[in-house]
Amino acid sequence: MNQTKPSKKFWLAVVIYSLVGQVAWVMENMYLNVFIYKMFNASAEEISLMVSASSIAATVTTLLIGALSDKIGKRKLFICGGYLLWGVSIWSFALIRMDVINALFPAAVSASSVCVSLVIIMDCVMTFFGSSANDACFNAWLTDASDSSNRGAVEGINSMMPLMAILVVFGGFMSFDQNLPETWVMIFGIIGTLVLGIGVLGFFLIDEKPVKTQGNEKYFANIFYGFRPSVIGQNKLLYLALGAYAVFNISIQIYMPYLILYYTVSL
């Protein structure tokens, strides 16, 4: 088999987008729980609601936007535009503060309850943009831009970035006083700017790869194709692997979003 050697520009895009995307997800999946607890005294039920709502938003978004990207044959637009809006949505959390909400809603019975509700809503909005850009289209672009001779290396880099992102976020923000509102303004400002910046960079760094749109014209049929019993029966080993991977990831997601909160509050 002939080895296809991607360009240095491609590898740079893989590293940057994989890492920054996962940094944003670490903030959303792990630090947002700390934010809503420390700033607004959110209950365990409210934190669980936020985690569940964002998980559903991520899953549905990936299916819908992934199918739409396949239908129109474009990845770059969704990646760059999604990262831009993802960065802006991260910035918006810096505005969810008690002093701001008290000024906007002076008659509110509980400003903290308003803040908790806004965080949950904006988490779903942020997840929509992030899943559109990263989960649905960036991962599809990786498949489009690689082949069987180099896909293992590409996916290897992409797969190690969640761990790298945890180290970056922990190392970067561990020394911050997370009991201060100003700290969270800084955290959201830094990550939002970083995500927005690579959204702009993508217009120059990402090369659009040809996407076969033939067979993807029927949008909803494309969405539900993978759920058909006949398709599952024809690809039993694939779905067995997907099922095992789903169980593994569900197990991780049961505790991982609460890990930092547990460390900071219980230990």
PLM regions with names:
Residues 2-57, 237-267:
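Helix-loop boundary and gating motifs at the non-cytosolic
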Residues 123-160:
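Cytoplasmic helix-loop-helix junction between adjacent transmembrane helices
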Residues 81-113:
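C-terminal ends and interior cores of transmembrane alpha-helices
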Residues 47-69, 88-89:
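Central cavity-lining transmembrane alpha-helices of secondary-active solute carriers
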Residues 1-8, 210-242:
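Juxtamembrane intracellular "pre-TM" segments in multi-pass secondary transporters
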Residues 54-59, 152-177:
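Glycine-rich segments within core transmembrane alpha-helices of 12-TM secondary carriers
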Residues 193-212:
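C-terminal membrane-cytosol helix-exit motif in multi-pass small-molecule transporters
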Residues 75, 109-110, 175-193:
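A membrane-interface helix-boundary motif in multi-pass transporters
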